[in-house]
Amino acid sequence: MVERAMLIGITLPGRDDATTRSLLDELRELVTTLGIGIQHEVQLSIRKPQAKFLLGTGKAEEMIEEAKAHNCDVIVIDNELTPAQQRNWEQAADDKILV
């Protein structure tokens, strides 16, 4: 079964949108090489990284719902997450997270 992915690019403080876009383009190529289809992409900017999800809880929940609405099997995030953040994403999104 071919998986369908939602990619999330996050512009952190100190990084510009063009850099995030470039990293998202690279991520798209890597995911496609793995045989995973890209169903949806989102680029977000955050002012301050949050401990639980990197994004705020409401925004993370919104991204999970958006992935479901686009029939995505997996969410791929272009930033490093702490082990706790990854676990929180996996629990919230039913283990459908790649970092």
Kindly label every feature range from the protein language model:
Residues M1-V99:
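N-terminal accessory targeting/assembly segments
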